[in-house]
UniProtKB/Swiss-Prot annotation:
PROSITE patterns: RIBOSOMAL_S15
Designated gene of the protein: rpsO
Annotated protein name in UniProt: Small ribosomal subunit protein uS15
Record's keyword terms, sorted: Ribonucleoprotein, Ribosomal protein, RNA-binding, rRNA-binding
Family: Belongs to the universal ribosomal protein uS15 family.
Amino acid sequence: MSITAERKTALIKDYAKGNKDTGSPEVQIAILTERITNLTAHFKTHGKDNHSRRGLLKLVSQRRSLLDYLKRKEEARYRTLIERLGIRR
């Protein structure tokens, strides 16, 4: 359900704007998207896991807030990111 340290490092490397950039909205949204994808796959086999479903909803809400922030601040970066991640919006 969680992502490995190697996968997280790869996501940071792919979406970061600089060498030590781990907190930009793009990086945070990419990591959240990976976690959401993993949890969605988890629910294919564990449909009644309501405790994890609550966590999933929290992650989706957090990602939505970050996406709204990015859209409000710089829409070009927002459009590029949702296209790159394959998020429908």
